[in-house]
Amino acid sequence: METNSSLFGLVSPSSHDLVIERLASVGVPKKYRSKRGLVEFVRANPAKISELVSALLPTDDDVKLGLKEARERPRKSAVSPTMKKRFRESMNMLQWLMFQDEPDVSLRNLAKLNLDQRGVCGSVWGQNDIAYRCRTCENDPTCAICVPCFQNGDHNSHDYSIIYTGGGCCDCGDETAWKPDGFCSNHKGSEQIRPLSENLANSVGPILDALFTCWNNKLLSAESSGQKGARSNDTLVILQKMSNELTFIVVEMLLEFSMSSESLLSFVSRRIISSSGLLSILLKAERFLDQDVMKKLHDLFLKLIGDPVFKCEFAKAFVSYYPVVISEVVKQGTDNAFKKYPLLSTFSVQILTVPTLTPFLVKEMNLLAMLLGCLSDIFVSCSGEDGLLQATKLERLCETSERVIGDLKFVMSHAIVSKYATHEHRELSRSWLTLLTFAQGMNPLKRETGIPIDEENDYMHLFFVLGHSIAVIHSLLVNGTYSAASDEEIENDRNAKEEFDKCDGDGERYAKVGRLSHEDSVCTAIVSSSSFDSSMASEVHKIDPFHALLPSSAIYLIRECLKVLETCLGNDEGISKFLCKLSSSSGRNIPESKMSWPRRDLLNVETGGSVSSNLASSSRDPSTGLSPLCGDIQTNLSLDNVCGPYGVVQTDVTADSKRVSCNSADLTKNASGLRILGLCDWPDIHYDVSSQAISVHLPLHRLLSLLIQKALRICYGESASYNGVSISHEIPHADFFSSVIGDFHPCGFSALVMEHVLQIRVFCAQVIAGMWKKNGDSALVSCEWYRSVRWSEQGLELDLFLLQCCAALAPADSYVDKLLSRFGLSSYLSLNPDITNEYEPVLVQEMLGLLIQILQERRFCGLSTAESLRREIIFKLATGDFTHSQLVKSLPRDLSKSDELQEVLDDVSVYCNPSGMNQGKYSLQSSCWKELDLYHPRWQSRDLQSAEERFSRYCGVSALTTQLPRWRMIYPPLKGLARIGTCKATFQIISSALYYALQSGTSVKSRAPDGVLITALQLLSLSLDICTQQRQSNSQDCCLENSIPILELAGLEIIGIAQGTEKESLLSLLVSLMKTRMGDGRHQFPEPGSCNISSWIGNLLKKFSAIDSVCMNLLQSLAPEVVGQSGFDKVMSGSTSDEKRKAKAKERQAAIMAKMKAEQSKFLSTLSSSMDDDDPRSEFETSDSVMEHDSEIAVREVCSLCHDPDSKDPVSFLIFLQKSKLLSFVDRGPPSWDQCPQSEKKISVDGAPDLLRMNASSDSLRISSPLMLQLSDDTISESANMIESIKARLIGNGQTEKRSSDGRGKDESNMESLEIAMYQTVRNKIENMINQSLTRVDHQPHEAENCSEKNSVGGPSTLQGRFPDIRSRQTSRRPDAGSDGFHPIDCDGVYLSSCGHAVHQSCLERYLKSLKERSGRRTVFEGAHIVDLKKKEFLCPVCRRLANSVLPECPGDLCSVSKLQDSPRTKLRRKDALQPSLWLSEALCLLRSAAEVIEDGDRGKTVTPQGDGPRRKDLKSVSKMLWDFYFPKPEDKTLKRLWLPPQSIVMWDTLKYSLISMEIGTRFAKNSMLPVYCIDSLYEELKTSKGTILSVLLRVVQSSRTKNTIHVRQRFVGMKHLAESICYGVSSSSSSSIFGSEGTTGSLKNIDLLWNRASDPVLAHDPFSSLMWALFCLPFPFLTCEESLLSLVHIFHSVSLVQTVIAYCACRPSELSELNFGENLLNDISNALRESGGWEYFRSNNMDLSCDIKDTIRKYSLPFLRRCALLWKLLKSTPRKLHEESDMFDLPSDPTTDNMDFIYSPQSELNHVQELEKMFNIPPIDIILNDELLRSSTQIWLQHFQREYRVNRVKRSLCITPVVPFQLMKLPNLYQDLLQRCIKKRCVNCTKVIEEPVLCLLCGSLCSPIWSPCCRESGCPNHAITCGAGTGVFLLIRRTTILLQRFARQSPWPSPYLDTFGEEDIDMIRGKRLYLNEERYAALTYLVGSHGLDRSSKVLGQTTIGAVLH
């Protein structure tokens, strides 16, 4: 074949033929060319294995043919075999050779041998899988195990947490990652892996070796072709395709092996290792293989590294490959290249965190040196000409640098590695210091003084993130540096210390300052001068006590850090200029300096260290082994620098000229040999922060600070006593610093080390003052981040400690003068009262605050760990109450991990348990407020102000005068700080501030406003505290002067001499200021936390007097009232002033009371005069008028929009109508979490088919529109004829007609008179029956059966003959009786609520119109993110709650007919009864009599029809919305226009359902899951606006249901059908054969639904619903008749009783024959069910069969009685103001109030039943069960129901439910159980994995949120419509929070799961165990169950429409 032939130019032969051809070419006979034949051939010819494997694998030519087929496949009819199929066939043949049998069978047999015997789990994770961390079992923080391993292990008592994975594998069974005690029962460690059997190993091994050899060769060919370039593109494509396909199939086979046998996997891993070069090329393969192939290869690696041997070899190859990737990325200069190599990110955490492996790699593979070299390469590429990191370059390699630094942290986190880098190979730590020079001073800022710039530094955060990572490495490095030495070394150091204690004489000690021992110089390779005497150094070592505690590595690192820092300091502009001046001289002495340390010549900066030559990098210098670093640090290595017995190499570090701008000369290596930090005199360096560059990034300073503070803590802190060695306090403290900093002079060290740190503090002060405003946000952000909690512990606090160290060593006055100079306040001491610039007061206050912090801060130099914890917690809790995690997060990193944390926290705080929506929080104990530190370094101005206000509120005094800074115990080396507080310079600053305050008073332009004055006085108080402690001290410290300057100068009149004013002293200034401020109290400082400056100054003067006798004498003359007054005089003067204040207060109080009395008298007189006006009406008329309009006055409202109190227009109440499925949820019961999560397209909440829609569309034929119009006219005529007939008959019988007195129309008045007449007729019949003692009604069964043939009440309806044409077109089958007849679409009912505010409908229309116009113009308006204007939603203009309609007020309608009183005989009968009896006869008589009156009137048609009555226009809005809820919109628009919905029937059904929902909402408390059985809880609901709006609705229905003749007739016919059903057990079929088709709409359809409902068997429906429809159909006066209402309650209570008995029997169908109830109602029902069935219709999910049946009956009647009680109370209620005083959903729930109403107990339910039975005069249960009338009626009801049931008309089951509260889904107590069950589940609709699963708490289905949907059907909005009628309550599984959905509206809600500290864990960040908080879950349940989602301001405040929640 020609090599230059085209890739796709050949005709492809069969792949099988090619294999046969190759087998023949290697000598395989024809008879062996099958799978089994090849096995036999291999057995006979083992030497042919290599050739045979090569022949079986596809060749390059096969790949070429495959590529050709792939190109031509779209043009062919048949699909050719793919390349993967060919390779799989080859692998199958190879597996035959390996196992010498069928591969699948062999692998299954191997799996059986290894069943439950796996050593390592190795399960590979994907993104966001669940895993567990266990801090008890893990070997490092990166280890984790999978869920099955965690469940199979015992971790209950361990410290574990849940995490979301980003990849990796399970560590269970891996001894290098997981402790053996934590292994699960299925994995026992890699040593438990059984070796492969010898026979199998002998057969598998050679085949694998040959295969791996071929694999290796193919990969090498692909790599070389890619690097060198192939001869043609075709060749490159073939090689790459071959390597990809072969790798994919081989890895696939090996992964299959790993799933079958761990022994086989281990065997494979050893073979890969033994295959020369394979592992190395596999790691490099990501450079030329496809990503999907590499993904599978990485999965294989994760499986294989479970074997320790393979992990070690893999780690070696990984370390070798690491710098190759970094070099390539740096070469390309972008992170995009790094993303192409995912191996590093995937496996660095797997390798570098292993405690046993990483140290091996560091020592054997120079891992640490390699990482430092990689980081050096990155820093060099990202640095600019000045040698500093640049933001733009660093951003391009951000991810790469983070990876390398992260790996450095992994490596350094091993204690042995950090010790290795600082003790054994110090050149590594030296290299790290050199790398820090790139970050030292990075991102400098310079103040803009010209045109403001709008500079947005998008990369600023990169420097802070880098600084944070560096700080973490510093912490690890310092820990390794100070790691404990051996016991022998400690013992030797103790002996050295004892010898040193015997020595005395300062001269001898000071002569050895800075000298090191010979051994130390060898170890550290430090050469300080050419005259160094090694024997002298050895002597120093013997007498130096600090070497007993401080390891030589720490001293070395401190000095090396100083030398590198010295190099960087030479590049500073200010220091460079200073060095230029000093270049000609050797320095001068500073008189103020008391330190007589030996002066040194200023030498070159030299550093030593043998640099490892193994820093593997292609860009490294071969002579040094180091990568070239930045230009300013260079390494000059030569043999001349080798010195000492060990030949340590010396490296000269010089500063590059690029970093020095002064004459382009290298100033640190000048002719004079200047040594910057060795300056003996205090340097006079000038620097202006406002005009020169400044950087907040000083990693070298921070490392130095860490090293020194750690050394101090070891020598003087808590850890000093642990080693048994303590430093004698007799040793001068200077010895510590001389031992640590060596031969660097204190003056040079202090002045130059503090320089940049001080500049940062000045920069922050200037930013606060507003000097950097023109720089945009860059300066402000840098300042805020520097001072923030997250960064301050890594910068600000360490910088402050450095300032303290420098202050302890520096001359005090020079130090303070430098502070003045850097703050730009040198002119502040001039005493010129004219302010120089606007920023000066802030700068002065910040400088004084810094001085106080330097003096009093003890974080690193005096406080123990417990004391620091206490201080930090108090600091945080002073600003507010916080959760546990917030407190821990606010602590410094080292303190947050302390074991003493919880103990200290409990000691200083009070824990508040979680309640309501509040999390568990800690608050500060009252006794701890006195420990508040106003000068904590991390105070932010806002937090400090809050703390001062809270202090003032809790303690009643000002924090400024009580929480004064104090001088506390400090480590002895830092006692020199005290000189700063008492020096002359500090005295001058304080005096100047007092002088300016006195000269300017309280002027705004004062150079010392109150803020400065208060801070100066606090500094003075601190200085006096220092003086007090010094005077009280028995012995003076050697570093402190015997005289105290501030006391000596306080009385000298030296202030104001130069200004020509009167001379003043500090004391005289204080006295004058005290007298000037004598009158300022709290009234002069209105803000909280103010203080009385005068009294404060008085206290300071007393301190002066107490400390110093000279000051006391001066003060006796200047202020004798302060110093010379006796105690008795003070008390007397104080008591006198108190009496004066009390007298003045009484006078003011009397004046106010007199004024109020006068105004009250004036008002009463006006009111009396108006009441005395003459009234022209008679007394009787006035009384009637008052009675009639009393209710109207009570509910009179003012429009919330126009606020016109004089408007006469009627107002309407704002209401909110919403669909509800609450009743269905209660009937069904809550789902359980342990059910399988499901996601369904349609969910039936009660488990039965949704028949509501079936009822709306029956089998009836549609009626054409013309016929419907004709029908409507006929119906109007018939209705009017019927009404007039009844009216004529009743009036003819002698009834009088009562006229309406409120001005209503004649027709309406006639219909009201008609209903009153009907009511009186029926009542007379009932009275007659009672008088005749009719206790029974003849209800024989045969009468019921034949009653349909009678022309009586139960006779055929008179409507049967109305429409013969239509009847012939209709089917005779009625709709199912399963529904309640009149139902909204897709829900149980409509719930009505109201906020209680009212508007004029005209005002509302204008308001809505304006909202629509603004929405059309896309103008933002309030509530735009909440309301849907298309649904006519809006927010109440007052309370901002949701509304969508209005309900007009209807005063007096309910009471327009006076309540009819019972006859005296009826009262007497009821009163004389011995016990209550069942009023069944009265109820039956009522129904029968009403039906008779209606039937009689229906026969007469003598009156001309009057037409359709008027409809109320003010009900148009609510009626239209209810109509849209109840019925779909008709297709024929004319029908909708002609036939408006009945206003009364839909509102009555809404009233009914709202009452039912209200009753359900009162079954549970707001914060408890226990049921509440209390009648008071029912009535409390009616007192809210919810109950009051129902009263308004009831009056509206009463006023509207008599206004339309069709509607009146509809009610009357419905009443007749209801009476037929109850009294005779007959269902009228006439209406169903006429109306009810799908095409009918309007009133005709409603008539059909109501009549069908009335005709249904009474047992087929809820008894309360039947009661409500009965009251609706009866003449309206019955609603106010107490006796009629009671009788109806009795009969429907009996219906409820019968339904319960049937449900009880339905729960025991097999035991019906065995039940023996006796001769009573129970036995009758049981027999009827056994004979005719029908019990399947009745079901109950809560039936307790163990309870007595009589108690069960009573309990199940409770829902009916409770709803009747609500209705009863509603009918008796009077109109009142509608507003709610507060939002019941937003108030914190009080557990005592909720549970005090009624405590649940088994007997409480029966007690509640007894209370309600007494209210309604219901007799005992035994009387009811034996009532003969009820027994006969029950037979009728049962026969009626069974007849309908047999014809299959009753389909939908009826759920009989007791008083059970509404409950959301029953959730597990432990959240991890729910998380494990719901995560990574597939959607039922689309089968996709739901990335962010959402659990519906209403039905238990798994859904997806709107921001991460898997499909439309499973989305939360669609599911909420299907499941909850638009309402959805979802638990976001990953986030742990709640999502509340209301159609398109959604809002977040707090999590119901809290941890042990009562705190939420959003997104499982902490991953700790979360427990279900019942109180929170109960509050959510109450919110949902009471329909409060759209009425809670908390919910609405977070509501959005369609937005993504984060």
UniProtKB/Swiss-Prot annotation:
One of its GO terms (biological process) is response to abscisic acid. Residues 1167-1186, 1338-1380 are annotated as: Disordered. It catalyses: S-ubiquitinyl-[E2 ubiquitin-conjugating enzyme]-L-cysteine + [acceptor protein]-L-lysine = [E2 ubiquitin-conjugating enzyme]-L-cysteine + N(6)-ubiquitinyl-[acceptor protein]-L-lysine. Residues 1338-1348, 1364-1377 have a biased composition (Basic and acidic residues). Pathway: Protein modification; protein ubiquitination. Disulfide bonds: none annotated. One of its GO terms (molecular function) is zinc ion binding. InterPro entries: E3_ELL-like, E3_ligase_UBR-like_C, UBR1-like, UBR1-like_winged-helix, WH_DNA-bd_sf, Znf_RING/FYVE/PHD, Znf_UBR. Keywords: Metal-binding, Plant defense, Transferase, Ubl conjugation pathway, Zinc, Zinc-finger. Its EC number is 2.3.2.27. Pfam families: PRT6_C, UBR1-like_wing, zf-UBR. CDD domains: RING-H2_UBR1-like, UBR-box_UBR3. Disruption phenotype: Reduced seed germination potential and inhibition of seedling establishment by sucrose. Exhibits abnormal shoot and leaf development. Increased tolerance of seedlings to submergence and starvation. Residues 1349-1360 have a biased composition (Polar residues). A zinc finger (UBR-type) spans 119-189. A zinc finger (RING-type) spans 1395-1440. Ubiquitin protein ligase which is a component of the N-end rule pathway with arginine specificity, and functions with the arginyltransferases ATE1 and ATE2. Recognizes and binds to proteins bearing specific N-terminal residues that are destabilizing according to the N-end rule, leading to their ubiquitination and subsequent degradation. Does not participate in degradation of proteins with N-terminal Phe or Leu. The N-end rule pathway regulates seed after-ripening, seedling sugar sensitivity, seedling lipid breakdown, and abscisic acid (ABA) sensitivity of germination. Belongs to the E3 ubiquitin-protein ligase UBR1-like family. This is E3 ubiquitin-protein ligase PRT6. The lineage of its organism: Eukaryota, Viridiplantae, Streptophyta, Embryophyta, Tracheophyta. The gene is PRT6.
